[in-house]
Amino acid sequence: SEMCIRDSFIAGRIEAAIDTYLKNLLPPMFKALAKFSQVHEYSWHTPGHTGGTAFMKAPAGRAYFDFFGENLFRSDLSISVGELGSLLDHSGPIGASEKYAAKVFGAHRTYHVTNGSSTSNRVIFMACVTHNQVALCDRNCHKSIEQAMTMSGAIPNYMMPLRNFYGIIGPIPPQALQAEAIKKTISENSLITKDIDSTPVHAIVTNSTYDGLCYNARRVEELLGQSVDRMHFDEAWYGYARFNPIYKDRFAMYGNPADHKPTDMTVFATQSTHKLLAALSQASFIHIREGKKNVDHSRFNESFMMQASTSPNYPIIASNDITAAMMDGKGGKALTDESIHEAVAFRQLMAKLNADFADQGEWFFNCWQPDFVKDAEGKKIAFRLANPEYLATEPECWVLHPNEAWHGFGDIEDGYCMLDPIKVSITTPGIGPDGLGKMGVPASILSAYLTANGIIPEKTTDFT
């Protein structure tokens, strides 16, 4: 009987451990949503499909219901469901989910956005800038930034990025972010007349660029902080950066949020969680580090509500909640490590094939990346022959060093910009630092071939 008591106690401890694990497994909003979906009550509120039952009344509707499954429709709910809180009030489990995401992503405040980072960018601009105020704007900005300036009445003062021989848009050079350079471009801006206060109130920079160029965010803040108090990084394609040390200091929410002082810039970041994290289409985050000229929650939320729907899609919010949970703790590093290692393997194989064909007097495609790197001992070595683990963990392998031919951005400040290893651009022959070659293969031909074989490229230009 003593053994039975002991076994029963151990079994109870195991059961308690399982219950604790399951209780802590799910993040706050999704946990509440999953729980509510199991409550089989009549629905007297929107949406009108009432948990999917309306679709059962017609053959086409039944096919739609069967395709997506019952849980989707049971979780498509209304703001009337008080148990889940409100996206507009940031209350209940939805509010708890935003606080959880802020902790995971290193922000003071985080907001769920259910209609993309285009809306996130507009929310920030409408909260920060008004008619005839000057905004410093990366010329390589998304159309939503231009739309936001139109809506707010802001006056853009563009900061011009570099461009290389491939046509790839590079970083804004650091000298263009200096206070003297900003003053000069403002003085030359015909939209800023004498009756307008020329002091910039907001700055927006795209980080990373579409081709994977990442700024040193500390350096950008150091430079632009001489001219403006609010910094806005459009990180639509870059929501994973906080979770791998290879990107250290190269994203808006770098470091410990507790170290961000009231005398530092107020920093905003927009991230499309649906692009390169595990969230549904249209899912986005706004992250905020509070500093100088902070926009408090009540004012910011007026802009948020102006852009948001009173009928948000709850599965989209839940997917944001889940992506935060997936990136929390050790999960984020494990997931990003896997992506980086796969990208490095692909890049090295492409470089090897390119070199092998060149030895035979033939051509092959390549990747836009360094031709050589320095190994752990400081020895220069061909990229294709470098230690893959070293490439996957050492940021210096990806930094744009001054006057290196491969990147084509000239005498750029060392350490200012880095190529993201997971953003792979395949290059086709036909152009180089010295101009057009004797023979070329337009990238559109390769893109058409890949598409015909079920591989859809994200972007195609002339030779990338």
Task: Identify the function of each model-found stretch.
Residues 111, 157-159, 458:
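General small-molecule cofactor/ligand-binding pocket signal
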Residues 7-74, 79:
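Terpene synthase/cyclase
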Residues 60-66, 109-112, 185:
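Short acidic/polar alpha-helix capping motifs at helix-coil junctions
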Residues 71-119:
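Conserved N-terminal alpha-helix of the aminotransferase class I/II PLP-enzyme fold
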Residues 341-464:
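Conserved C-terminal alpha-helix-loop-beta "cap" of PLP-dependent enzymes
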Residues 119-355:
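Conserved PLP-enzyme active-site core in the AAT-like
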